[in-house]
Amino acid sequence: MQRAAVKEHADYAAEVFLRGIFAYEEIEFTLEGRADGIFTAADGVTVVDEIKTTACPAADITPDFAPEHWAQAIVYAAIYAAQHELEEMRVQLTYFQVDEELILRFERHYTAQQLQEEVEALLAEYAPWARRAVEWKKARNSDLQAMQFPFPAYRPGQRAMAGEVYKVCRDGGRLLCQAPTGIGKSMSV
């Protein structure tokens, strides 16, 4: 699909990595991914092309076939528009129907402001979950900081095991520990 697009659009860039930081309420989101393609249309408007392969019947593939595909491409377009200070962009979904070897394309035009608003709407849906995750991490970290080691000193063999675990974490590799019950293996690790 991308090779054919390169023939059609000389400036077609495939697999373009994009990363953008978006703030929603008090949460900062880093959104990233690879746009399947980005090119300039004949009218000078930049297009983000998101390619999907499907075995669904071609008759079922409509512009509203999969809203999540639009969402993905819109996020890429919002990032690209912001990074390149573009006032408008087009988002194109390209579906390749494998059984019929049929290509279907759908396009939508957006201003940079509309793209930003679309991303904010997505983040509004995701924010409650993200907020709970942030709160849980804060509580976990606070509990871990307050946690006391259960014994006043290392038990026999415990310090050596903790040192070996540290070395494996630092250098990579695997470690197999065999020690009697009650030595404090879990706490050492």
Protein language model regions, located:
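Acidic-basic catalytic patches of nuclease active cores, encompassing PD-(D/E)XK
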Residues: 1-22
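Short, charged/polar micro-motifs that form catalytic or ligand-binding hotspots
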Residues: 62-70, 148-151, 179-183
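Polybasic (Lys/Arg-rich)
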Residues: 113-146
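Motif I (Walker A/P-loop) of helicase-class P-loop NTPases
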Residues: 185-189
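Short, highly selective alpha-helical patches that border small-molecule cofactor pockets
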Residues: 1-2, 73, 77, 162
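Conserved pre-motif I regulatory segment
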Residues: 134-180
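Hydrophobic helix-cap positions at the C-terminus of alpha-helices
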Residues: 4-5, 80-83, 168
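Mg2+/Mn2+-dependent nuclease catalytic core
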Residues: 20-117
